């Protein structure tokens, strides 16, 4: 039974690569549309869009999900609720595939909400305080995006259709672009919605591999890609997206440099790469953003699975200060992490190099990118190389504060097979897609020094690491306040989550005091109760003194009558 399951997952991985290579040479687009409801002014249909973008991305999701499912057989083997966990994982993947294939914004909401619901359940899988708070933060942040998508649907309602890839409005809605962009930013954790992404690391590592490579966080980028016509028609939207994405890039890079949690460092690297994709869309290069989306998904999944092997084999230690010289003990996992880190840094001839190099060179040629924006981009990319070198020299090769055993650890076949399947993509996917897809065939014209600067970026972080690491302990950057600033992502976690909680609780307290405990009580049950009580007290007084009142009145009447008789 287990061999049949492994064979099925292997076929899923091969099918994914078949989709990728077929989609890269796919020149047509097919729209399968089934009418559901029609009227004189409005129609609704269930539709699927099959083009090169959807085929390549579905193939990427299948490759990564098949690899992660195989990996889970080793990583989650001792879990009591393994079947429930895998059911949630497959529901997660199904929601993402549904979102990729559906161009109808109304039906896309099913996959969009499915991702939000299953991510909440997967992040809260371990059912402790940390996991539950992280799941709640993830769910509430994604609710903002859900509301913005619903507002976008209401705007599309006035246009008579919901197809986002062919939006030709009767009336141009300037706010629609902002709605779509900010909805995508909540899912892709761009500033100021970035606090939930590191918190989601409370989920099991295989879930993190799926979330940070090809499902949840990439859903926002994919929505913005599909809505490119809406965004490009409003220059203010692209300018806002450019500024926020560049600041997110620098924020994520600088925070990852000072972070000690291995999974958090990798999560922040995901955030920096997502901001690069958003930046590419903002300068009207959606195909380059998609190119990097695919290559990044593969090598980031490989990096997370390698990190999961390290953590699982070292008694769940995630602090890089407690991990050292693991190359001898975990050669396969370290090899996987090495390939992924080299590709993440944009080293020549790896998948990440082709997409990231193209993105940087085209941004140099774009007149809308100012020198300040370009410097922020370079700074963020240097940070990427810096923390990549930090992982290599600390976890793999270095001797840190804890001396771990250098004995060879048995790496299970279910652990090695996903590494092999993702090795292929991390090494050759960039050159294959770059050579086969016509939309990636840009002509780059740069000066020699500009081209050399792009080539130098992967090594800049290495040089910076070797020069700074010896002085970091005595540097003002290592003070408690500086570390607190960077480890809290520029206090973004407090600024985006704490004020919302304060406003919500104080607002609810005010509403409760003024309405629930105020006017509603005064005019409602308590007011009626008080009024009836006063009336009953008055009635009781009247009833008690009724005979006395009657006797007094009768006496007065008799006295009055007698007086009249006597004096008359």
Swiss-Prot record:
The chain crosses the membrane at residues 7-27, 44-64, 90-110, 144-164, 165-185, 210-232, 240-260, 274-294, 297-317, 334-354, 378-398, 426-446, 452-472, 547-567. Keywords: Electron transport, Membrane, Mitochondrion, Mitochondrion inner membrane, NAD, Respiratory chain, Translocase, Transmembrane, Transmembrane helix, Transport, Ubiquinone. It catalyses: a ubiquinone + NADH + 5 H(+)(in) = a ubiquinol + NAD(+) + 4 H(+)(out). GO terms for cellular component: mitochondrial inner membrane. Signal peptide: none annotated. GO terms for molecular function: NADH dehydrogenase (ubiquinone) activity. One of its GO terms (biological process) is electron transport coupled proton transport. The keyword Translocase applies. It is an enzyme of class 7 (translocase). Its main location: mitochondrion. The keyword Membrane applies. PANTHER family: NADH-UBIQUINONE OXIDOREDUCTASE CHAIN 5. Belongs to the complex I subunit 5 family. This is NADH-ubiquinone oxidoreductase chain 5.
């Amino acid at each position: 039974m287990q061999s049949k399951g492994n064979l099925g997952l292997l076929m899923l991985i091969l099918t994914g690569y078949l989709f990728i290579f077929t989609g890269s040479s796919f020149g047509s687009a097919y729209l399968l549309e089934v009418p559901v409801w029609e009227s004189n002014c409005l129609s609704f249909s269930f539709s699927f869009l099959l083009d090169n973008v959807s085929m390549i991305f579905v193939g990427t999701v299948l490759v990564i999900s098949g690899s992660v499912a195989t990996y889970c057989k080793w990583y989650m083997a001792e879990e009591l609720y393994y079947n429930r966990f895998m059911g949630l994982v497959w529901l997660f993947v199904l929601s993402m595939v549904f979102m990729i294939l559906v161009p109808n914004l109304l039906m896309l909401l099913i996959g969009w909400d499915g991702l939000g619901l299953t991510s909440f359940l997967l992040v809260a899988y371990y059912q402790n305080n940390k996991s539950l708070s992280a799941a709640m933060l993830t769910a509430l942040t994604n609710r903002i995006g859900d509301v913005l998508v619903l507002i976008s649907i209401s705007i599309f309602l006035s246009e008579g259709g919901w197809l986002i890839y062919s939006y030709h409005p009767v009336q141009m809605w300037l706010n629609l672009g902002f709605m779509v962009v900010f909805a995508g930013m909540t899912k892709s954790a761009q500033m100021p919605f970035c606090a939930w992404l590191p918190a989601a690391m409370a989920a099991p590592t295989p879930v993190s591999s799926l979330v940070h490579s090809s499902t949840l966080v990439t859903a926002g980028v994919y929505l913005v890609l599909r809505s490119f016509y809406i965004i490009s028609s409003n220059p203010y939207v692209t300018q806002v997206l450019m500024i926020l994405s560049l600041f997110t890039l620098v924020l994520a890079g600088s925070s990852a440099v000072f972070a000690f949690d291995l999974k958090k460092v990798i999560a922040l690297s995901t955030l920096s790469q997502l901001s690069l994709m958003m930046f590419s869309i903002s300068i009207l290069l959606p195909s380059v953003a998609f190119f990097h989306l695919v290559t990044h998904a593969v090598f980031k999944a490989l990096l997370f699975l390698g990190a999961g092997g390290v953590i699982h084999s070292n008694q769940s230690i995630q602090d890089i200060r407690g991990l050292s010289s693991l190359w001898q003990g975990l050669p396969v996992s370290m090899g996987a992490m090495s390939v992924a880190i080299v590709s993440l840094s944009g080293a020549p001839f790896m998948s990440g190099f082709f997409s990231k190099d193209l993105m940087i060179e085209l941004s140099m040629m774009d007149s809308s990118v100012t020198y300040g924006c370009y410097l922020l981009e370079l700074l963020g990319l240097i940070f990427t190389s810096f923390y990549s070198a930090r992982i290599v020299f600390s976890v793999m090769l270095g001797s840190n504060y804890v001396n771990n055993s250098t004995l060879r650890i048995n790496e299970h076949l279910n652990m090695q097979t996903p590494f092999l399947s993702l090795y292929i993509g991390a090494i050759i996917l960039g050159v294959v897609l770059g050579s086969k897809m016509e939309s990636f065939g840009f002509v780059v014209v740069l000066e020699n020094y500009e081209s050399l600067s792009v080539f130098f970026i992967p090594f800049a972080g290495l040089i910076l690491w070797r020069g700074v690491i010896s002085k970091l302990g005595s540097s003002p950057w290592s003070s408690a306040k500086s570390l607190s600033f960077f480890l809290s992502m520029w206090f973004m976690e407090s600024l985006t989550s704490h004020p919302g909680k304060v406003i919500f609780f104080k607002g609810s307290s005010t509403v409760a005091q003024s309405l629930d405990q105020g006017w509603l009580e005064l005019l409602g049950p308590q007011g009626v109760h008080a009024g009836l009580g006063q009336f009953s007290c008055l009635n009781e007084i009247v009833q008690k003194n009724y005979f006395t009142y009657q006797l007094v009145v009768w006496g007065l009447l008799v006295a009055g009558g007698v007086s009249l008789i006597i004096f008359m």
